[in-house]
């Protein structure tokens, strides 16, 4: 938390002759702490320098020598107290604390883990709960297409008809063969990691070989990716407006049986998402994830929920949706 302090200095009055008394009012504003998840205090205060007097006019008297004398004026106690009393505070809610409190009400069964990140698009406020890394499963398909679009932009070209066919099947229907084709096209993990470096993802690492579903990521990184997809040029998106519009459109046309997840907190059909689900053969447990943009209560939110260790896919979906609802309450129930 940063702070700024008003600095006051005093200047000694030269001896040997008298000078008219100067009156000044000093106003300082001290801002103590300012962050999206901290508390901002704005303090307005009037100060008087050492030996200052009230603003009432002095009563000078002329001597035979022409010198000017100044009567001393005693400040009242109330004036002195007023110096430190004028204060106003504007509080910015700690969303991380609210999210942690809301998530405490979510039942996480057995060996399951869950992490969630939310951004209020309008205000720019965000919150993250949980810092662990998770398998992406099929949510990485958004990242794969974003990387492909970025590479196409760099080459000054549009996607080919074949690439568009793969992209549509990969996002709308979560087709794995299409994902493998585009994963190979972008250069696998190396290509994905290079794109993610430009996107600002710092905790995501592409899966080995053709195992794109085992890419590791964090909820915070998925929120960063969503800001690339649903952001603007002014918010620093590396994707062009045309690329963003294309990807958003696909995420808004998800197959009927795959519309669960973060859509649980949306108003009607006001969502664009991608879900991921993957049974791990070593444990028999499920990775279940959901990322996307939702509109709730007239506000747009970006939401990412990651989970693993779920006994079944259905239980994972229930956990993800409960976490999304809890996360939304940290922004809407205040």
Enumerate the predicted regions with their spans.
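Glycine/small-residue-rich loop that forms an oxyanion/phosphate-binding "nest" at active or ligand-binding sites
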Residues: 148, 173, 180, 184
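Acidic helix-start/capping segments at beta-turn-to-alpha-helix junctions
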Residues: 119-124, 161-175, 186-187
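Active-site SXXK
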Residues: 124, 133-157, 170, 303
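A short glycine/serine-rich beta->alpha loop
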Residues: 128-135, 208-211
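Amphipathic coiled-coil signal-relay and dimerization helices
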Residues: 124-131, 271-272
């Amino acid at each position: 938390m940063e702070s700024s302090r008003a600095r006051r200095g005093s200047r000694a009055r030269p001896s040997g002759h008298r000078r008219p008394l100067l009156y000044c009012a000093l106003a300082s504003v001290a801002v103590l702490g300012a962050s999206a998840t901290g508390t901002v205090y704005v303090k307005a205060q009037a100060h008087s320098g050492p030996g200052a007097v009230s603003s009432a006019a002095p009563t000078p008297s002329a001597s035979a020598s022409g010198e000017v004398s100044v009567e001393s004026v005693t400040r009242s106690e109330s004036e002195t107290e007023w110096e430190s009393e004028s204060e106003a505070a504007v509080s910015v809610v700690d969303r991380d604390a609210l999210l942690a409190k809301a998530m405490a009400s979510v039942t996480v069964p057995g060996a399951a883990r869950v992490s969630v990140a939310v951004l209020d698009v309008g205000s720019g406020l965000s919150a993250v709960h949980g810092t662990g890394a998770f398998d992406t499963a099929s949510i990485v398909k958004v990242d794969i297409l974003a990387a492909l679009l970025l590479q196409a932009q760099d080459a000054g070209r549009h996607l080919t008809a074949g690439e568009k066919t793969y992209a549509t099947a990969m996002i709308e229907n979560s087709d794995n063969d299409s994902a493998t084709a585009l994963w190979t096209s972008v250069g696998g993990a190396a290509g994905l990691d290079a794109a993610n470096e430009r996107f600002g993802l710092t905790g995501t690492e592409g899966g080995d070989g053709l195992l794109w579903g085992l890419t590791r990521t964090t909820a915070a990184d998925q929120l960063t990716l969503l800001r690339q997809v649903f952001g603007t040029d002014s918010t620093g998106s590396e994707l062009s407006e045309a690329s963003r519009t294309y990807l958003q459109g696909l995420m808004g046309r998800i197959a009927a049986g795959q519309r669960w997840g973060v859509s649980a907190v949306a108003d009607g059909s006001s969502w664009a998402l991608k879900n991921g689900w993957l049974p791990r053969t070593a444990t028999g447990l499920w990775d279940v994830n959901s990322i996307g943009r939702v509109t709730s209560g007239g506000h747009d939110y970006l939401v990412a929920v990651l989970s693993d260790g779920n006994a079944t896919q259905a239980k994972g979906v229930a956990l993800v949706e409960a976490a999304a609802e809890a996360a939304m309450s940290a922004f809407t129930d205040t």
